[in-house]
Structures are given as C-alpha cells and as structure tokens.
C-alpha cells in the first residue's frame, strides 16, 4: 500500500465513522472532507458500499476515484488495493471497477459505472469474483444524491 493509498484509507475510515452512525439501509448519503466527496449506502446487514470521488488529482493530473466496501466486521476493501478486483453487477451487466484511472479503458469503465449506478435499484458487489454483498437502493434517492460523470470523472 503506498503513502497516497494509506492516507486515503485513513480519510475514508474517518468519514465512514460518521456515515455508519446514521445510515438508513438503502438510502445513499453524501459526505465531504479534504477534497473527497463520498457517496455511501448500507444494506440491512450493515455492509457499506462507498463511491469516493476525489477532487485532488495525482502527480499526472488524473483523479483517482475509487470504491470501498466495508464489511460487517469493519474490514474494508478498496478498488485501489493491490491484488483486489471489485466488480459491480447491476441490471444484468458487470462493471469491473478500475484500480487506477488516467488510461482510456479505465476512464471509460469508470464513466459507464458512474452513469449507470444512478439508475439502478439493486446491485451486487463482487470482490475477487466472490459475491460480497447485495444492495437494494431507493431510486429517487439515488437520482438526487449520486454524482454525474462530470462530478466524478476524468474529463
């Protein structure tokens, strides 16, 4: 884990603490801190899925957005973790979350994910090809709260 990943991890943990205190299952909520906007939703078992939209570009000028999955035992998995693949399945289509952005295929995959997550009422999260959670969300809430590609992209 690099220093940037570690600092993002610490930031995410501190933001997650505030999210979990008042999270209503199935409703997206937004938080902001130190240049990161995070959108989180919990399921009924207490798992939390978070979209991290950073406002801080890396040394090459790219925004390294990511997703996190916090499990019920508070272990956290990030799309930036080495050796970890995170895939979101919604509406019978899979979205492999890129571990880095700033390259055409990764940016295109992220764009498609951000476009479509706003339009789905249910999605599954897979970590290393194993189902890790199912999230059922309120569609009206998702449309109001979740970012558009312009708010969470690399364009």
Regions from the language model: what does each represent?
Residues 22-155:
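A generic "folded-domain core" signal
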Residues 18-20:
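N-terminal signal peptide c-region/cleavage motif recognized by signal peptidases
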Residues 1-10:
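Bacterial N-terminal signal peptides that target proteins for export
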């Amino acid at each position: 884990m690099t220093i940037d990943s570690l600092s993002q991890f610490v930031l995410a943990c501190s933001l997650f603490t505030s999210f979990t205190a008042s999270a209503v299952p199935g409703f997206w909520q937004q938080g902001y801190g130190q240049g990161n906007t995070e959108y989180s939703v919990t399921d009924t078992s207490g798992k939390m899925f978070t979209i991290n939209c950073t406002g801080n570009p890396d040394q090459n000028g790219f925004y390294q957005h990511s997703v996190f999955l916090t499990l019920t035992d508070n272990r956290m998995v990030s799309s930036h973790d080495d050796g970890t693949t995170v895939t979101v399945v919604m509406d019978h289509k899979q979205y492999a979350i890129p571990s880095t952005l700033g390259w055409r295929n990764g940016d295109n995959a992220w764009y498609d994910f951000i476009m479509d997550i706003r339009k789905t009422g249910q999605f599954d999260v897979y970590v290393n090809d194993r189902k890790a959670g199912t999230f059922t969300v309120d569609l009206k809430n998702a449309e109001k709260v979740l970012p558009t590609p312009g708010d969470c992209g690399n364009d």
